[in-house]
C-alpha cells in the first residue's frame, strides 16, 4: 500500500524487480522529447492529466519493457516512458524531478558522457532550449509529485 515512484534508473530498478529485463535502448534519449500518454495512461491518477502528450526532459541510454501485469502509461518514439505496477507503484523513464541547475550541470558535462555525444544532440542548442522549457516542466513535475503524494492511504 505504500506509494512508490521510480524515476529513470529508479524506474528501471522497479521494473526489474517486477520481472522486466532492463536493456540498452535502440538509441539514447538526451534532452527534450515528446511523450505520448497511452489510453490506459489517460485514466491514471499521475499521468492522466498530462494526456494526450507532453514534452519531457530525458537523459538515458537504457530502457525497460513492460513488466508482467503492469499497465502501460506513456511512450516515446524510443521506449516505454512509464507504467504502473499495482495500484500505487509507478516506474517512469523521464526526469520530472530535474531542476534547471541539474539539467545545466548534465549539459555542461555532456562531453564526458559517450552516449550523450553519440546521440547527436548539440549541447550548445540544448542548454538554451532547456532554459526556455524548464520552468514549465518543473510545474509539470511538481504537479505530478502532488498527485503521487495524494495516492498515499
Predicted regions and their residues:
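Amide-donor transfer/coupling interface in amidating biosynthetic enzymes
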Residues: 23, 38-153
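Cysteine-nucleophile active-site neighborhood
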Residues: 1-41
